[in-house]
């Protein structure tokens, strides 16, 4: 019977997660890990999305009041003209805004790349010291940052190229070209791009420890991981499946925890409001001054609590990947192990 490494690594990941977080519990360590994971993002960051709304739910398919092609062409031409005038009028401000957004995005992206190495060092050694790990991984973070941006720029270029035929026709005023079929290349490129990026980032996730502990660059580490994976295809496929299932389970669990904490926060807010009302405070008289600030403070505090409580999830996932990787590179990662105290020798009974 085949020994699936990814399945066997689950128990070890649970054990190591318990050791780093609860044996013993260290609040300072938790706070440092929360800071690291905040910059990395992912599970525990408190981000969420709402995809339940449908703007077409009421009248989708009702073309009784549809416009003629001539009216649509005129509308598109007028819209393009107005946008062009706006862009030419505020070109300087638009360029400055884009540059600022790109600069801030690049800065946080570099910090996120750098924190990937800080995170690996922290969980491998069970010693979280952010500044020391940052100083020793500035170059590694830059290499990962460059690769990350290269991949996403290539993906963005592919998306733009897939939409060029439809966009060029629309800019020329040919609205009839904007059919569903004209966007099929976009959907194909988008889906294939997401799949390819997911595979690449799965290997990058495994390559980061190789970079750290074999002192090689990102491309060399990726080459080593991909070469080893090519000889263990069934293990890699099972690894991806188990990681996907674990990600779904952890995502659902994190969502449930978030909902429970939000519900508790709402109950606390209602209780505080009722107590203040009974004490004679008229909050609505100052709602325009207090409520926005109180709501913002409460939202930030709640997001931090959710992020803090869900810290074990990304740590477990990182340990799972590291233990899977250790089956390929048994000697490269200096895993911290708990020191067991020797059992006291039995005292001989007096004769």
Model-predicted regions and their roles:
Residues 1-182, 186-192, 197-251, 284, ...:
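Helix-coil boundary and N-terminal low-complexity module in membrane systems
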């Amino acid at each position: 019977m085949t020994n699936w490494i990814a399945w066997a690594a689950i128990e070890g990941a649970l054990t190591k997660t318990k050791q780093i977080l609860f044996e013993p519990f260290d609040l300072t360590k938790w706070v440092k890990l929360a800071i690291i994971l905040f910059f990395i993002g992912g599970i525990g960051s408190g981000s969420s999305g709402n995809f339940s709304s449908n703007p077409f739910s009421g009248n989708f398919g009702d073309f009784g009041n549809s416009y003629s092609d001539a009216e649509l062409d005129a509308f598109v031409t007028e819209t393009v003209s107005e946008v062009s005038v706006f862009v030419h009028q505020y070109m300087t401000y638009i360029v400055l805004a884009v540059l600022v957004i790109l600069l801030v995005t690049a800065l946080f992206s570099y910090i996120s790349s750098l924190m990937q190495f800080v995170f690996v060092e922290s969980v491998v050694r069970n010693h979280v010291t952010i500044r020391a790990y940052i100083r020793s991984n500035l170059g590694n973070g830059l290499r990962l940052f460059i690769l990350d941006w290269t991949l996403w720029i290539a993906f963005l270029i592919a998306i733009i190229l897939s939409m060029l035929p439809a966009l060029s026709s629309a800019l020329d005023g040919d609205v009839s070209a904007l059919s569903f079929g004209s966007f099929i290349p976009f959907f194909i490129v988008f889906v294939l791009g997401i799949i390819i990026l997911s595979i690449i980032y799965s290997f990058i996730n495994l390559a980061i420890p190789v970079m750290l502990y074999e002192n090689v660059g990102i491309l060399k580490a990726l080459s080593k991981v991909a070469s080893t994976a090519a000889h263990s295809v069934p293990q890699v496929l099972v690894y991806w499946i188990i990681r996907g299932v674990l990600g779904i389970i952890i995502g659902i669990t994190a969502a449930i925890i978030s909902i429970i904490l939000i519900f508790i926060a709402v109950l606390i807010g209602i209780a505080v409001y009722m107590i203040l009302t009974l004490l004679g405070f008229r909050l609505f008289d100052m709602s325009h001054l207090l409520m926005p600030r109180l709501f913002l403070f409460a939202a930030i505090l709640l997001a931090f609590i959710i992020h803090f409580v869900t810290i074990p999830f990304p740590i477990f996932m990182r340990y799972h990947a590291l233990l899977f990787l250790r089956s390929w590179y048994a000697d490269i990662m200096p895993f911290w192990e708990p020191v067991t105290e020797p059992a006291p020798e039995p005292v001989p009974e007096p004769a």
